[in-house]
Amino acid sequence: NGEHGVWQYKVDLALPCATQNELDIEDAKMLVANGVTSVTEGANMPTTLEATKYLQENGVLFVGGKAANAGGVATSALEMSQNSERLSWTFEEVDGKLKGIMETIYANISDAAKRYNMTVGGNTDYVAGANIAGFEKVVDAMLAQVFANPKHLAGATSSNQLDIRL
């Protein structure tokens, strides 16, 4: 913050993975000036909102931590599943399951962003896609719970049938 640290170097891809707000607007400006093409968060909110907007508006492909950082949570869930079933998976089995989960996350956020034409700086807005996909998942779970009283649904059986406006 302020001194740029690792963000001062010319790179194609930047991966902020440490502390919250570690990549600020000045760092973002330096990355853009040095030609960065993509920033992918590997932690919870390591990029300030101002820096995120600057990167996106300047054509940098930005993938936020909601999606990109989901691997840690997914692996924890796999470990809990493995432990509850008293199983012992190999590294390759866990890695394969995690790969499938991450591919599904990417497909979901990419699809959501495309369905709502969410782009910024000429790139797919994966931050918006992750927010939309997460919202739809919550809506679908809520709808599943409401089937006991369908008059609240107005005919919708999934989030895809609701009129969601952004």
Map each language-model feature to its residues.
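N-terminal low-complexity segments that are often proline-rich with Ser/Thr-Pro
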Residues: 153-166
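A structured beta-alpha segment of the ubiquitous adenosine-cofactor-binding alpha/beta core
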Residues: 1-27
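Metal-centered catalytic cores of metalloenzymes
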Residues: 4-9, 28-36, 44, 162-164
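Adenosine-phosphate binding glycine-rich loop
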Residues: 17, 30-154
